[in-house]
Amino acid sequence: LLKDFNENEILKMVKWCADNNFKQTFIEVMPVGKVDLQRSNQFLPVSFAKEKIKKAFGLDPIFFKTNGPSRYYQTNKLNNIIGFISPLTNNFCSTCNRIRVTSNGILYPCLGDNGSTNLIDILKFDDNKLSQKIRRIIFNKPEKHFFTVDDKTYITNRYMNTTGG
């Protein structure tokens, strides 16, 4: 979700996804990497989208679980499922089960942290040691991220497109 960019297309996206039997997820912009713009001007909380969708189509929370951080809702009038990921307004770190591995072999246990391990360096270990090392990295994931929506703070030195989400 981006303020002044796609906030007026939310209902169109919901309708299109419902008409084409797609599930969709709305995600708050994550302050990842240093950018030359004012993040606070772009920030749009998922509550904005939820309220807009609720007024137009009805919206109720449902028990629908995947392996990701999305919280799911169902529209009453369209009967489609919509996910919401809110790293800033409703931190989900306590249930995060994700790690990311880049194409050049760097393992990042958290999107909101610069901590990383070069897997290429540990591939020389036997499978048991490699497995132990990766398990240790996962076990020591940061407890939470420190994302903010101010214009001065950026948490990581890398951008989302280099890490994957």
Model-derived segments and spans:
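Short flanking/linker segments adjacent to small metal-binding domains or redox-active Cys/His motifs
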Residues: 138-165
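Conserved C-terminal portion of the radical SAM core fold
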Residues: 1-36, 51-59, 102-104
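Accessory C-terminal segments flanking Radical SAM cores
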Residues: 32-148
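Short, electropositive alpha-helical surface patch
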Residues: 6-23, 78-90, 161-165
